[in-house]
Design a protein with these regions (language model features):
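Signature of the first transmembrane helix
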Residues: 6-62, 211-238, 244, 248, ...
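Helix-loop junctions and terminal segments of transmembrane helices
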Residues: 27, 31, 60-76, 250-274, ...
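Transmembrane helix-bundle signature of multi-pass secondary active exporters and lipid flippases
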Residues: 50-58, 243-259, 263, 292, ...
């Protein structure tokens, strides 16, 4: 009985990780299912749509959600927020929803109305806000449910469609995402009595912080998602779908661990930070990331060789190797980002954003003129992430000194 209780207690403590893992596994399988059941161009359109909602989830509140995280006070299990944040949050979410939807509809031939897309975009932004509010309250399970419910729902709906009709179309996918986000909104009722507003922040401070965070979010979003928009514009929707499929197989597993590291290590660095600890963790994460990359490549070889699933490993080996290298670099970045998130002030944030923007502006013309293949584009992406890692590391060294 004691063992059973310990097991239940362990599950309760780490259930948020189970939800995170379930959502990530569902998303992984969703992309594989849709690759097999959607037409190549529709899969490319699905890829750009997922990129769009991921992008809007990142900076849909124009940096104000980071102001909430930085300045919120937790007392008696309640979140105390500044009243001055209300209008900026409402305005930014509506503005981004309308502008983002307008740009998407005008650039991509997707068979949904602009009103429907505005609604989805607005729900995506609110979902990320709900996630952050639950996270502030240390309700990690609820935060992960809010963030991952649409992935879990979509996976089960796709299973039903495949088993019953053996037919899946893009409209079914988008409609399922919409209704899953609508259901997620009911989690707001769990926050109504937990969030209180007080006048404790000046508007000038709120907007100055939001601008700094927005710059940071734009730079990270640009190198996180910009490659997909570039590949679509340079090589077309079908090639984007092809690329999206391979990043799902060979980069997404790294991103899953990257999210976990960011989730865990920022708390560790807030409790105690020093350079020796950082170097020790960097060596460890580099070693295990390389080993994981070797495992991923070996596992894929056996899957392809034994014909469990057709990956065309050798035909795409150069691109796959570049994606694994990118995954290793992003793992290192996730640790540096956690350390920076734990100790940085506005001055440090401004510097790293400035250096990052300069490096991106220098490389953009080079990427534009020399990216003749998807593999070369990934190589430039690795360079961008490596430069970002160097910038972060140098700033952390200055902090220590």
């Amino acid at each position: 009985m004691g063992l059973k209780n310990r097991f239940i207690d362990l599950c309760n403590k780490h259930f948020s990780l189970l939800v995170l893992g379930g959502g990530s596994a569902s998303f992984f399988l969703i992309n594989i299912i849709l690759k097999d059941y959607l037409h190549a161009e529709n899969y490319g359109l699905y890829s750009i749509f997922i990129t769009y909602i991921s992008l809007l989830s990142s900076f849909g509140l124009l940096g104000f959600e980071q102001v909430i995280i930085r300045n919120a006070k937790i007392t008696s299990n309640k979140i105390i927020l500044s009243k001055s944040l209300l209008i900026p949050i409402i305005f930014s979410s509506l503005f981004v929803s309308i502008l983002g939807s307008y740009l998407f509809i005008n650039n991509y031939n997707i068979s949904i109305s602009i009103i429907f897309l505005i609604s989805i975009t607005f729900l995506v932004i609110l979902t990320k806000l709900i996630f952050n509010l639950f996270r502030l309250m240390s309700k990690f399970t609820f935060s992960q449910i809010a963030l991952n419910f649409w992935k879990l729902s979509l996976f089960f709906v796709l299973l039903i469609l495949v088993l019953r009709k053996n037919v899946v179309n893009l409209e079914d996918v988008i409609t399922t995402i919409f209704w899953s986000l609508v259901i997620t909104m009911f989690m707001v009722f769990g926050l109504l009595k937990k969030v209180k507003f007080r006048s404790n922040l000046k508007a000038k401070r709120i907007f100055s912080q939001a601008i700094l965070f927005l710059l940071s979010l734009i730079t990270i979003s640009l190198i996180n998602f910009g490659d997909r928009f570039f590949i679509e514009s340079r090589f077309g929707l079908e090639e984007l779908g092809y690329y999206f499929f391979f990043i799902n197989l060979f980069l997404f597993p790294f991103v899953l661990f990257q999210s976990y590291i960011g989730f865990k290590e920022i708390v560790s660095f807030k409790l105690s930070y020093n350079h020796n600890l950082l170097v020790q963790k960097l060596k460890s994460i580099l070693k295990y990331s390389i080993l994981f990359g070797i495992f991923l490549l070996s596992f894929s070889f056996f899957v392809d060789y034994l014909e469990f699933y057709s990956i065309d490993l050798f035909e795409n080996l150069e691109m796959i190797l570049m994606l694994i290298v990118l995954g290793v670099v992003k793992m290192v970045y996730s640790l540096l980002s956690s350390a920076m998130g734990a100790i940085c002030d506005n001055k440090m944030l401004f510097k790293i954003n400035l250096y990052s923007i300069i490096s991106i502006l220098i490389l953009i013309p080079v990427i534009y003129y020399y990216s003749s293949t998807i593999t070369i584009t990934i190589m430039f992406l690795i360079v961008l992430w490596f430069i970002r890692c160097v910038i972060w590391y140098k700033q952390l060294l200055l902090y220590e000194n």
